[in-house]
Amino acid sequence: MSKFRSLADIRRDYGELQLSEESAENDPISQFKLWFDDVLLNEKNDPTAMVLSTVDEKGYPDSRVVLLKGLENGNFIFYTNYQSAKAMQIQKNPYAALNFYWPQMARQVRVRGRVKKISSEQSDAYFSSRPIKSQFSAIVSPQSQEILDRISLEDALNQLIEEYGQKPVVRPENWGGYMIIPDEIEFWQGRDNRLHDRIHYYRHGHEWTHRRLAP
């Protein structure tokens, strides 16, 4: 007998948390901040982790986990190499989706919107706040390109550290931040018996409107 359970039999109860139209905030950013405060208290691992989805020139979707590094003026901010695969896809198709999933609270937030680079000043400020070895890694890594092996990458990192010594590290031009300007945000609260709560916010002109969706 296989020691693995059937995938179809894997399930769990989601608990008693709920999301109603009456309790939902009028705008999704306020609702996100409310939930995120709860998440910081209850989620043990990577509460800022989010799946970023983009589309390449052939229409193929790509997804990867990145970290939320800011929520400014209602925009979701992350950082990356501007020559990475995700950056090339954003350049050709400046729209993306985010998916936050917090299993301890059975909560999910989906975001869809436009993508823009943030200012150089913002990227400089964040880059200088990173641990020094993370700064060097951003310089030495040709992200998404083929490399010979890990040892050559580590050798390049060590050489760069030796060359810089105590000098301040300057952010490379090919590294910085993006903001996702949301047009839609959906909040999902897992409920027992699979009758989940879904509240969907969408822009209506300059205002936000929300509605309940069937699970």
Curated annotation (Swiss-Prot):
Q: What are the recorded GO MF terms, alphabetically?
A: FMN binding; pyridoxamine phosphate oxidase activity
An example GO BP is:
pyridoxine biosynthetic process
Keyword annotations: Flavoprotein, FMN, Oxidoreductase, Pyridoxine biosynthesis
Transmembrane regions listed in the UniProt entry: none
Q: State the superkingdom.
A: Bacteria
UniProt remark on cofactor binding: Binds 1 FMN per subunit.
- The disulfides recorded in the entry are none
Q: Which reaction does it catalyse?
A: pyridoxamine 5'-phosphate + O2 + H2O = pyridoxal 5'-phosphate + H2O2 + NH4(+); pyridoxine 5'-phosphate + O2 = pyridoxal 5'-phosphate + H2O2
Q: In which pathway does it act?
A: Cofactor metabolism; pyridoxal 5'-phosphate salvage; pyridoxal 5'-phosphate from pyridoxamine 5'-phosphate: step 1/1; Cofactor metabolism; pyridoxal 5'-phosphate salvage; pyridoxal 5'-phosphate from pyridoxine 5'-phosphate: step 1/1
Kindly report, in one word, the top-level EC class recorded for this enzyme. oxidoreductase
- Give the cofactors, semicolon-separated: FMN
Binding-site residues for FMN, renumbered to this chain: R64, V65, V66, L67, L68, K69, Y79, T80, K86, Q108, Q143, S144, W188, R198
Coiled-coil positions are: none
What is an example of a Pfam family matching this protein?
A: PNPOx_N
Q: What does this protein do?
A: Catalyzes the oxidation of either pyridoxine 5'-phosphate (PNP) or pyridoxamine 5'-phosphate (PMP) into pyridoxal 5'-phosphate (PLP).
Stated family? Belongs to the pyridoxamine 5'-phosphate oxidase family.
Subunit architecture? Homodimer.
Q: What is this protein called?
A: Pyridoxine/pyridoxamine 5'-phosphate oxidase
From what organism does this protein derive? Legionella pneumophila (strain Lens)
Gene that produces this protein: pdxH
